[in-house]
Regions:
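Solvent-exposed, polar/charged alpha-helical surfaces in well-ordered, non-transmembrane soluble domains
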Residues: 14-18, 53, 57, 133-136, ...
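C-terminal capping alpha-helices of c-type cytochrome domains
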Residues: 1-4, 9, 60, 81-83, ...
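Accessory interdomain/linker segments of ATP-dependent helicases and helicase-like nucleic-acid enzymes
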Residues: 3, 32-35
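Gly/Gly-Pro-rich "capping" loops immediately C-terminal to redox-active cysteine motifs
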Residues: 35-61, 71-125
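Short, solvent-exposed loop/turn and secondary-structure capping segments
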Residues: 31, 39-42, 150-151
């Protein structure tokens, strides 16, 4: 949790919301208030957990702070079926993977021909993809996603 006091941020949150929905493609992986994808963190209250500087860093250098629960995995089953996606859980003998189509696969490790854990983010860097102004607007939008104090 960022835990610090709220700060004023530059940028236009309304423009940031449009970027989130459209050009950024964020909804394919991230969820806000129950709408969106499952393969990335839920951003419903991201403004409570990240500072504006952290949000910007997450957008331009997504590999810097990837938590293990967001690691990905590529496997090939002994029947030749390849599967790649988010590593949902992994034990000594089994692994479960959520693929890009939100299908959950479960494998016994002894049945895998190949297995590779990928400890980088599946999120692309938006450095060079979004302008500085667009990044500022997107950060303003994301930083405004906070817990409803009345709820």
């Amino acid at each position: 949790l960022s835990g610090g006091p709220r700060v004023e941020v530059p940028g236009d949150p309304a423009k940031g919301a449009r970027l989130y929905q459209d050009k950024g493609g964020c909804t394919s992986c991230h969820m806000i208030d129950g709408a969106g994808g499952l393969s990335g963190p839920d951003l419903s209250t991201i403004g409570d957990r990240r500072s504006p500087a952290d949000l910007l860093s997450d957008l331009v250098e997504p590999d810097e702070r990837v938590m293990p629960r967001w690691w990905r995995m590529r496997v090939v089953h002994r029947d030749g079926t390849p599967v790649a996606g988010r590593r949902m859980n992994e034990g000594t003998y089994s692994v479960r993977i959520l693929d890009e189509d939100n299908r959950l696969w479960s494998f016994q490790k002894r049945d895998l021909r190949e297995s590779e854990r990928i400890e980088t983010s599946s999120m692309p860097s938006y450095a060079g993809e979004l302008s500085d102004d667009e990044l500022t607007d997107l950060v303003a939008y994301l930083y405004g996603l906070i817990r409803d104090e009345e709820g």
